């Protein structure tokens, strides 16, 4: 029997979400027949990973110092297999600026964007009209390295542009400003390393203005429609683009690609999640259920893929 250590918690703004994911994974792995331990991961407890002598580490950390390649690199040094993508893909996908640049280079569709850095930003000298000329209104403001929509704003009025920039810059050294694309929010779970497979496409219908933190983690705040209300041609295109994006950044094991399908049926990649949530309201478990895969079976698959790396 393989021994699995579940890493949860962490020190990022997404700590509470990580704890929920970790607890769900802990129980699911026990149901799958594994010997399971759990560790609330902090700088003070990192040394205990070796003490557990796990065969596999199941990472349910979200955000900085967990999803960004740092923990993955530490586990590589220890020689312990772990779930999800490796160091490079984790680091790339944690940074939305680098991800956007890479996707654009690969010719994959993503919304027009501009990068603003904290260094040199002066609210008194900044001219919001320049962003409005490039993107119009509404526009989207995101911190580069936050997850779960933390610090993200959809700005519909000129007077709210600078406050949205300041909010995002309070959380990060650089931020993204994107053209807002109206349409259908979709997400695709991709599995594997070489022979990629996808789980059913999910359409996300948030109760709030967009798929924000509350919509993601509060029960009843979003509907996950499976199958998505899109044509077969659109579904195939979305799956194809998702697999190309997953492969372009070097993901392995599993990941979730978030997209928007505009009103003309054109898909745009929003984000690539290398450690998507595993809570009771999370999308990946929902997609697996729609494919006939129970939660313990899904976790068992992730562990086996980690051991095959």
Curated annotation (Swiss-Prot):
SUPFAM superfamilies: Glutathione synthetase ATP-binding domain-like, PreATP-grasp domain. This is D-alanine--D-alanine ligase. It catalyses: 2 D-alanine + ATP = D-alanyl-D-alanine + ADP + phosphate + H(+). Pathway: Cell wall biogenesis; peptidoglycan biosynthesis. Binds 2 magnesium or manganese ions per subunit. Mg(2+) 2 binds at residues 271, 273. InterPro entries: ATP-grasp, ATP_grasp_subdomain_1, D-Ala_lig_Van_CS, D_ala_D_ala, Dala_Dala_lig_C, Dala_Dala_lig_N, PreATP-grasp_dom_sf. Residues 100-304 form the ATP-grasp domain. Its cofactor is Mg(2+); Mn(2+). NCBIfam families: D_ala_D_alaTIGR (TIGR01205), PRK01372.1 (NF002378), PRK01966.1-4 (NF002528). Cell wall formation. It is found in: Cytoplasm. One of its GO terms (cellular component) is cytoplasm. ATP binds at residues 132-187. The gene is ddl. GO terms for biological process: cell wall organization; peptidoglycan biosynthetic process; regulation of cell shape. GO terms for molecular function: ATP binding; D-alanine-D-alanine ligase activity; metal ion binding. HAMAP family: Dala_Dala_lig. Its EC number is 6.3.2.4. Keywords: ATP-binding, Cell shape, Cell wall biogenesis/degradation, Cytoplasm, Ligase, Magnesium, Manganese, Metal-binding, Nucleotide-binding, Peptidoglycan synthesis. Belongs to the D-alanine--D-alanine ligase family.
């Amino acid at each position: 029997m393989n021994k699995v250590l579940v890493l949860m918690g962490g020190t990022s703004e997404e700590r509470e979400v990580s704890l929920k994911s970790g607890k769900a994974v802990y129980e699911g792995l026990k149901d799958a027949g594994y010997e399971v331990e759990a560790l609330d991961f902090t700088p003070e407890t990192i040394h205990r990973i070796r003490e557990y002598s796990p065969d596999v580490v199941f990472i349910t950390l979200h955000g900085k110092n967990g999803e960004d390649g740092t923990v993955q690199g530490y586990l590589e040094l220890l020689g312990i297999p772990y779930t999800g993508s490796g160091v490079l893909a984790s680091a790339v996908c944690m940074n939305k600026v680098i991800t956007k640049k890479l996707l654009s280079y690969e010719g994959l569709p993503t919304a027009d964007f501009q990068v603003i850095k904290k260094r040199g930003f002066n609210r008194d000298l900044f001219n919001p009209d320049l962003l409005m000329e490039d993107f119009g209104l509404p526009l989207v403001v995101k911190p580069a390295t936050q997850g779960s929509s933390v610090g993200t704003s959809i700005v519909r009025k000129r007077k709210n542009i600078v406050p949205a920039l300041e909010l995002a810059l309070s959380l990060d050294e650089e931020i993204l400003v994107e053209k807002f694309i109206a349409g259908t929010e979709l997400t695709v779970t991709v599995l594997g390393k070489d022979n990629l497979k996808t789980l059913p496409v999910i359409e996300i219908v948030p109760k709030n203005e967009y798929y924000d933190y509350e919509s993601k983690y509060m029960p009843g705040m979003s509907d996950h429609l499976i199958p998505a209300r899109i044509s077969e041609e659109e579904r195939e295109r979305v799956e194809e683009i998702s697999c190309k994006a997953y492969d372009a950044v070097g993901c392995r094991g599993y990941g979730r690609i978030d997209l928007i399908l505009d009103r003309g049926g054109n898909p745009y990649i929003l984000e690539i999640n290398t450690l998507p949530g595993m809570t009771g309201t999370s999308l990946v478990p929902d997609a697996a259920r729609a494919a006939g895969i129970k939660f313990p079976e899904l976790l068992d698959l992730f562990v086996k893929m980690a051991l095959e790396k």
